[in-house]
Amino acid sequence: MEKQGKTKQFYMHKIANLLNVQKIVTIHYQELDKTYASEEETHDFWELIYADKENVSIVKEGERVPLKQGEMIFIKPNQRHFVESCGKEPNIFIISFECRSESMKFFFDKKYSVPDNYRYLLQNIMSEATETFVIPDFDPHL
């Protein structure tokens, strides 16, 4: 006996790729001393800075932005900036990357508090990075 089935209908949904990271430039975790201040820099890629322990200041285009433990900020391409400690020994996590997606405009000049239950995602990124890449020790003079 031949089995006759119904013709199934499938619906295809196009996935919108709102953010496309073309390249990872750097990924590193820095344990800074209490008097640390980086050199001012500018570059043609994005940078995400996350304060993992203690607070830091991000100075961008001359404006000081306090970054508390558990907060992150995006530095847009070609924005002058530097990082400095606030009298304690902070730890920061930095990912710099190339992304030309229009959706990145959403992150211009914003900082975010990362909820405790999402911080593990940043830890997973760092873990994957150390398993995948050779990450040199942090040199504060670079």
Summary of predicted features, one role per range:
Residues 78-105:
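Ligand-binding loop in jelly-roll beta-barrel domains
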Residues 55-56, 77-79:
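Short beta->alpha connector loops
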Residues 30, 51, 95-100, 130:
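Generic beta-structure capping elements
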Residues 104-142:
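Amphipathic alpha-helical segments enriched in hydrophobic/aromatic residues interleaved with Lys/Arg
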Residues 62-77:
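Short acidic-glycine-tyrosine-enriched beta hairpin
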Residues 1-60, 65-66:
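Generic protein-terminus/edge-of-domain signal
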Residues 67, 95, 114:
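Hydrophobic residues at beta-strand termini and immediately following loops
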